[in-house]
């Protein structure tokens, strides 16, 4: 039991298997890779490559704290990301990513474990991601605020990259990951 996850592990029901992810793992034709992110208590970013297509699941990762330079409080500097993060995301077809905060709100919520929309979009553009699905929105935001954030992200991406589309993820959504 930890401060950010109040349910004791022993209370979880069902069969739970653990797999050390210190190297790539193959399950059938899929290759699963991981890299550490930044979040209180730790977090892992997952990439699945399957038959020429790739998807990354990146939630509860405070990408702003992974920046080498730039960020919401230094708008005059471009955001600079670690090369290993850019390589990990490079050319993926789908990025499902935490996008809890606007750039303005992030300044008030630094170190809470979630990124700013500007950092998410800049990372996607620099990594040449195909489609971005924004998720894990601030629970205080209503549909209007979330829609505006998604629209702003789409506009920003269109100015930074000739490719890439922004979508709002929603509960029950099924995403086809193809080339």
Residue ranges and their predicted role:
Residues 1-69, 142-179:
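Binuclear metal-dependent hydrolase catalytic cores
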Residues 65-164:
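Cap/insert and terminal regions of metallo-dependent hydrolase folds
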């Amino acid at each position: 039991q930890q401060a950010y996850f109040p349910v004791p592990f022993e209370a979880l029901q069902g069969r739970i298997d653990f797999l050390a992810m210190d190297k790539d793992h193959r399950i059938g034709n899929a290759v699963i890779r991981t890299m550490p992110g930044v979040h209180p208590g730790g977090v892992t970013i997952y990439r699945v490559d399957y038959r020429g297509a790739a998807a990354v699941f990146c939630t509860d990762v405070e990408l702003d704290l992974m920046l080498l330079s730039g960020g919401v409080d230094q708008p005059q500097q471009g955001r600079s990301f670690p090369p290993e993060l850019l390589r990990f995301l490079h050319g993926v077809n789908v990025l499902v990513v935490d996008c809890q905060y606007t750039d303005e709100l992030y300044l008030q919520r630094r170190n809470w474990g979630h990124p700013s929309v500007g950092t998410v979009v800049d990372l996607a553009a620099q990594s040449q991601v195909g489609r971005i699905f924004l998720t894990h929105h601030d629970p205080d935001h209503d549909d209007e605020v979330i829609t505006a954030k998604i629209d702003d992200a789409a506009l920003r991406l269109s100015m930074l990259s000739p490719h890439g589309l922004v979508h709002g993820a929603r509960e029950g959504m099924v995403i086809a990951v193809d080339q």
